[in-house]
């Protein structure tokens, strides 16, 4: 039985990820419930679990309504965030491995955007489901072409988190929770106007977005080649980039 991955764009720029296998599904960071319920019902799916990468309202806002419709669904979130994600039914921490839909998910600590931010990693390690994975549900830590703002962590925290993502295989899909790619790459082209890989990717993403298509998922390899934050050699370099990006205003 093969898994499939689906992206639901919601609100202004959020992306809710749905992982389906057979007639069962897992949803990641549901900002709102209605589009998820519509998709599940249209495809005859049963919601088995909700994965929460961090506590921000635009990631957990749809969870209460989803649980009213699917009360048997697990809510998997960081144990360290149990007070801010109170509906969690399974607390996890760095290094934990959980099983959902017959697959293993690894939990990694990528705290920086928030103090208890986690990511969920699925390796390409299942002979019965060979085309699904590797991938990373990375929330707001790693974005296509960027990284999350440092609301509760430091540049050192973000540097460490991005190094953990960089250690994943290049083909790992980057399933982040916001469609910020075009603006991120526009900023990057201003910093490195002669970088052909960045400018080429920016033009590709601009074309996708002009048609209303998502640029996601990305890949770890693409981020290594074109994401200035992933290329930072020190936490100090990352801090300088983050400060510059925080004060940048797109035209």
Curated annotation (Swiss-Prot):
Entry's EC annotation: 3.1.2.6
InterPro entries: Clx_II_MBL (IPR035680), Glyoxalase_II_hydrolase (IPR050110), HAGH_C (IPR032282), Hydroxyacylglutathione_Hdrlase (IPR017782), Metallo-B-lactamas (IPR001279), RibonucZ/Hydroxyglut_hydro (IPR036866)
Residues bound to Zn(2+) 1: 54, 56, 113, 140
Keywords, ordered alphabetically: Hydrolase, Metal-binding, Zinc
Biological process per Gene Ontology, one example term: methylglyoxal catabolic process to D-lactate via S-lactoyl-glutathione
Subunit structure: Monomer.
Family: Belongs to the metallo-beta-lactamase superfamily. Glyoxalase II family.
Name the record gives this protein: Hydroxyacylglutathione hydrolase
């Amino acid at each position: 039985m093969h898994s499939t991955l689906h992206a639901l764009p919601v609100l202004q720029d959020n992306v809710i990820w749905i992982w389906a296998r057979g007639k069962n599904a897992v949803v990641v960071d549901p900002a709102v419930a209605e589009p998820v319920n519509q998709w599940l019902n249209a495809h005859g799916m049963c919601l088995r679990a909700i994965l929460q990468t961090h506590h921000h309202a635009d990631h957990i806002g749809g969870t209460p309504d989803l649980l009213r419709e699917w009360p048997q669904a697990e809510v998997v979130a960081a144990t360290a965030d149990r007070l801010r994600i109170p509906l969690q039914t399974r607390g996890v921490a760095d290094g934990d491995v959980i099983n959902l839909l017959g697959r293993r998910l690894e939990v990694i600590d990528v705290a920086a955007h928030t103090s208890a931010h986690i990511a969920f990693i699925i390796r390409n390690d299942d002979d019965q489901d060979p085309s699904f994975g590797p991938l990373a549900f990375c929330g707001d830590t790693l974005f296509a072409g960027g990284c999350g703002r440092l609301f509760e962590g430091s540049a050192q925290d973000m540097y460490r988190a991005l190094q953990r993502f960089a250690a994943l295989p290049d083909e790992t899909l980057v399933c982040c929770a916001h469609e910020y790619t075009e603006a991120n790459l526009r900023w990057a082209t201003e910093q490195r106007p002669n970088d052909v890989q960045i400018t080429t990717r920016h033009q590709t993403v601009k074309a996708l977005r002009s048609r209303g298509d998502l640029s996601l998922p990305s890949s770890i390899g693409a981020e290594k080649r074109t994401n200035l934050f992933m290329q930072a050699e020190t936490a100090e370099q990352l801090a300088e980039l983050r400060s510059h990006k925080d004060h940048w205003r797109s035209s």
